[in-house]
């Protein structure tokens, strides 16, 4: 499914319509407010890193208005990941998130994915720490233990922007047993020539973060990474293969996903036609074509946006899409012992 969204208008160009299931949740009363909480979550997966990352990491939680009124109801959760060099503190999305949560009952959780190099890429690295493990084995279980969540794949969505969109996409396709819904906005993904084109737009700061995540080498000086020379030498080609694997190797990712017994329930990709980094829309179009070729149902949204994510994009795109999927769930049963 390909959609064009220009400003607030949605134009469906596919024979397959969007799901029109309305939320089963009643809108919150006028004046009802969401609650925003900041946590410090144990992150032992990061122990021993070489970049000074703390073994407690911030996690930000938006609760719908009804959460404080009902002591037993459990809620589905959208896990969100921020872009490179951005804050994982999603207070800047307040208008869009709160408008969505006043209409639909789910929790939004932003797990920190930004480190001292300004981006983790959700990678397990001997340099920056095992961030993927932190997300999956520490942060999400912590949320399930401390909030009244629907701790099932159907009760979890994952989304993100740019680097965070890449994190969300990898998590979803690699772990459909944990997440059932994906919404990635301008994710970092490569087509066949993505690395070469992207290298033209990356500054040294980004190269350092990407290299430490995907081509770590503790024998090298800080930030302990190997960099491709792009000269075609055997050493360069070996390093380049590691760099391509980061945002690339999408056919391998999808083939590995198809080999699993579990399928995602809903997938959406959104990208702006005016993105300042042309390799990103090129990569998204490539991924869209790949998914279509593999017969995997998904929604592809082209907008008039630049490389950006704000409250309006959440309210008009990610929020409603996730809400439609959660609305298909049966009304959550009361929890016998709700945290």
Residue spans of the language-model regions?
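Bacterial N-terminal signal peptides
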Residues: 6-17
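N-terminal secretory signal peptides that target proteins for export/translocation
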Residues: 1-3
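Non-catalytic cap/lid and distal C-terminal segments of serine-dependent acyl enzymes
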Residues: 23-339
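N-terminal signal peptide c-region/cleavage motif recognized by signal peptidases
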Residues: 17-23
